[in-house]
Amino acid sequence: MDITILGSGTAVPSLDRNSSGVLIQEQNTHSLVDFGYGTLKALLHLGISYHDIDRIFFTHNHPDHMCDLVPFLFGARYHLSPRKKDLEIVAGPGFGEYFENLMSAFKNWLVPSEYQIRITEIDEGTKDFGCFSVISKKVRHIQISRGYRFENLDGKSVALSGDTDYCDGMIELGREADLMILECAMPDEEKIAGHLVPSLVGKLAKEAKCKTLCLTHFYPPCNMEIIRKTVSAIYKGDLFLAQDLMRFQL
């Protein structure tokens, strides 16, 4: 399983960090977890186009986690090279209605010309997707928010939080995972509801006992040295601070 950070940033535009997005490649399939702005271009840097994506998982529907879906769908209609492979979009309950409203807002300009879109709503539980299974659990951000754990046929696992505060659901998803990708939105002194700070990241990762931890979703007040020092004082596993296009192999 190959995992690439497409965007390690936030809702605040940055020259250095795209908004949230992760690419998971397994057995010649390409799955996205979130699709924030800038991530579509990051895919092109990897040689991956709108033809290649098989499935998109959304942790929730805030713009910094999904707005590159619009140019993706619009580009896939390009008449000289239209997408032909069906696309599955996976998200929490209520996403189907949200997606219909999004499509309506753009009239017919996002409607596929030569492929079908299937919306799969999953609440909490496990679903088999062939080359991997996905466990979904509620996390603490907004009502639709879900965290995911991907497990391939070799037993390798990656857990992803999207946006979340400290919660049991994310601890369970990250339990002894080979890799856990957690948001670390703000420094401790700037804590806001629905987001993690370094001390809580360290506590969550320690309780989950994940093997490797990658932090992402850094708002401008974040100081990387302080984040690393604070988290490392609590969590003793391997720690990475995400950069766009950082890759992991499991």
Label every model-predicted segment.
Residues 1-46, 146-162, 179:
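Conserved beta-strand hairpin/beta-sheet module of binuclear metal-dependent hydrolase folds
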Residues 43, 69-72, 99-102, 170, ...:
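Hydrophobic packing residues within well-ordered alpha-helices of enzyme cores
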Residues 86-88, 92-145:
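Metallo-beta-lactamase
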Residues 48-51, 85, 113-115, 130-132, ...:
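Structured loop/turn residues at beta-strand edges in well-structured enzyme cores
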Residues 166-248:
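Cap/insert and terminal regions of metallo-dependent hydrolase folds
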Residues 32-36, 54-60, 92, 158-162, ...:
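Active-site neighborhood of phospho(di)ester-bond hydrolases with catalytic His/Asp-centered motifs
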Residues 72-88, 140-146, 151-152, 193-214, ...:
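P-loop/Walker A phosphate-binding loop and immediately adjacent motor/lid segment at beta-alpha junctions
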Residues 38-90:
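Active-site metal-binding motif and surrounding structural segment of the metallo-beta-lactamase
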